[in-house]
Amino acid sequence: MKYQQLENLESGWKWKYLVKKHREGELITRYIEASAAQEAVDELLSLENEPVLVNGWIDKHMNPELVNRMKQTIRARRKRHFNAEHQHTRKKSIDLEFIVWQRLAGLAQRRGKTLSETIVQLIEDAENKEKYANKMSSLKQDLQALLGKE
């Protein structure tokens, strides 16, 4: 395992995940009966400040269909949490106008790359074009100097 699991912190993330899903209208409990489901949700809401008990609630009441999705969410959150500790692994964000994002996303999709890889490739292409233009300009000046000496 690359990233250390921190039980209290991750239990808090799980609690927030489940509450968010409940507020979005998803069924977070394994119960079909509305009163049993609401009872379990009320119990979950009361556990906000007791992260260790959240795991017990999950084992007892959580909808099995949410298990893998929650694991993926927590894994991604753990990765972001630990990557944020170091400048070189910390994610940066930029604001793009929608049309710019749309064109960039289309280009990335056509190239089969991520947005970040596409941006790096575009920067490298621009740098190479600039180097080529400078080299051609230098060759042109040298050629003119040679022809001018005759």
UniProtKB/Swiss-Prot annotation:
GO terms for molecular function: sequence-specific DNA binding. It is found in: Cytoplasm. It comes from the Bacteria. One of its GO terms (biological process) is cell division. Keywords: Cell cycle, Cell division, Cytoplasm, DNA-binding. It holds the Pfam family MatP_C. GO terms for cellular component: cytoplasm. Homodimer. This is Macrodomain Ter protein. It comes from Escherichia coli O1:K1 / APEC.
